[in-house]
């Protein structure tokens, strides 16, 4: 009787869809039973230990990326470099990751894997390259070489290709069902926030604790990198022993997607579908929204040590605490928001984050012109910028996997990662060169980019609409 009931439900859905098709109302449909027990594809998840290692890798990689922020400007000056090099040092890893993105994709998807991604390969590569990078950075003072710092950050950039796989892992249809992609995307952002929070704090704390050291090996500029090298060794060994690879789908039952309207008018859900102009436009707009959000975050983050030094005479340790406290506040906010994502669509989340960034920029410009740039409002603005940028970027890949044909998921994923890598690099260089131009220029560029993102999202708003019906 139960099987007959499920069959009747499926037939009723099929009849409804046939009527719609006859009336000229086009839809993209994949059917599945309404019985949750009969539809494991609606709830399948990746191996717990592997997912935990991917999240932990994300956090520690963000620490490696930002641990130099509080001390980079002083370290460069200590070695005789110019002011602009501080931003280059911060942003160099992501541009390196962008250059190496295609080779890493080939490395992680060999022919023997039959189309599946071997996540262990980029995971292992990120650990090894970070170990080498941190050791080289820590030896730069001994060598009295700014060039060695740059080379060390290039090695860190090899590891930063892993940022692509953090997002891809939690949107891979072979590992995780569509039901969990948005929430796991937010959790991934929370872990990144923890790393972005801990990085400046650890960097400032290690600098303060070793400030009196006269050694060229272990001092305020290098101690944090020695610490991270040891942490990466531990993560490498743990991953080598425990990481579980999935090279086949966890279920043969497909996910259900019923759309009342075309998500992309010229993308048909069949094996012969083409991406088309609208599909390319959707990918571009979603990627650009991620670029504008992360450009703002990285520009602010790189400028905080400089700006607080100019306005409040902050030390590296104080600047690191400033950055870390903002991140600590954001962690519970993002956790709460991860619960609220069940009531919001992906496009709503992206738009909300971009609008919050615009409001923050308008307030900061107003405060700047009134001459009341006290530390408290500046801190609140940076905290909200952190939150807005994090939520604006968190569902980008998840959204593209819902509105694009599966054969184009990788293209969308790579496009988002390219935009983030560019924003990390350009934003960090822009913020690191804060002394070279007026604060008004800084605010204006950040504001214009986010306004453009909102306008672009509104233009294609209907194309981003998707209604999911999960078993």
Curated annotation (Swiss-Prot):
Subcellular location: Golgi apparatus; Membrane
One Gene Ontology molecular-function label: transmembrane transporter activity
Chain segments annotated as transmembrane: 48-68, 85-105, 123-140, 145-165, 186-206, 223-243, 277-297, 320-340, 349-369, 379-399, 414-434, 440-460
Any one Gene Ontology cellular component term annotated for this protein: Golgi apparatus
Keywords: Golgi apparatus, Membrane, Transmembrane, Transmembrane helix, Transport
InterPro entries: MFS, MFS_Domain-Containing_Protein, MFS_trans_sf
Any GO BP: transmembrane transport
Membrane topology term: Multi-pass membrane protein
CDD domains from the UniProt entry: MFS_MFSD8
Domain of life: Eukaryota
Record's keyword annotation contains rRNA-binding: no
Family of this protein: Belongs to the major facilitator superfamily.
Protein name as annotated: Uncharacterized MFS-type transporter C757.11c
